[in-house]
Amino acid sequence: MLADKVKLSAKEILEKEFKTGVRGYKQEDVDKFLDMVIKDYEAFHQEIEELQQENLQLKKQLEEANKRQPAQSNTTNFDILKRLSNLEKHVFGSKLYD
């Protein structure tokens, strides 16, 4: 999924060779800069992996919570009906059930 969007990998950056001209860039400066870019790529890749794992975990938790919610609602309705029945018995006494 990530490989489709990213054009360069850390390995490709590391192995990239630049031709030198008469008055080209200092190779040492280019190498230092590319090393920083590689470290950033690796850090971003690691962060993306961790976030994708967390995202999957949260989706599973949400799915489980949604599955449990209707069961809790039925239990709550049962409790309300039971309390209502007890209140009716208390208010109207046994006349209601005779």
UniProtKB/Swiss-Prot annotation:
It is found in: Cytoplasm. Residues 34-72 form a coiled coil. GO terms for biological process: cell division; regulation of cell shape. Signal peptide: none annotated. Gene3D superfamilies: 6.10.250.660. It comes from the Bacteria. Keywords: Cell cycle, Cell division, Cell shape, Coiled coil, Cytoplasm. It holds the Pfam family DivIVA. GO terms for cellular component: cytoplasm. HAMAP family: GpsB. PANTHER family: CELL CYCLE PROTEIN GPSB, CELL DIVISION PROTEIN DIVIVA. Divisome component that associates with the complex late in its assembly, after the Z-ring is formed, and is dependent on DivIC and PBP2B for its recruitment to the divisome. Together with EzrA, is a key component of the system that regulates PBP1 localization during cell cycle progression. Its main role could be the removal of PBP1 from the cell pole after pole maturation is completed. Also contributes to the recruitment of PBP1 to the division complex. Not essential for septum formation. Belongs to the GpsB family. Forms polymers through the coiled coil domains. Interacts with PBP1, MreC and EzrA. NCBIfam families: DivI1A_domain, PRK14127.1. This is Cell cycle protein GpsB. It comes from Bacillus licheniformis (strain ATCC 14580 / DSM 13 / JCM 2505 / CCUG 7422 / NBRC 12200 / NCIMB 9375 / NCTC 10341 / NRRL NRS-1264 / Gibson 46). The lineage of its organism: Bacteria, Bacillati, Bacillota, Bacilli, Bacillales. The gene is gpsB.
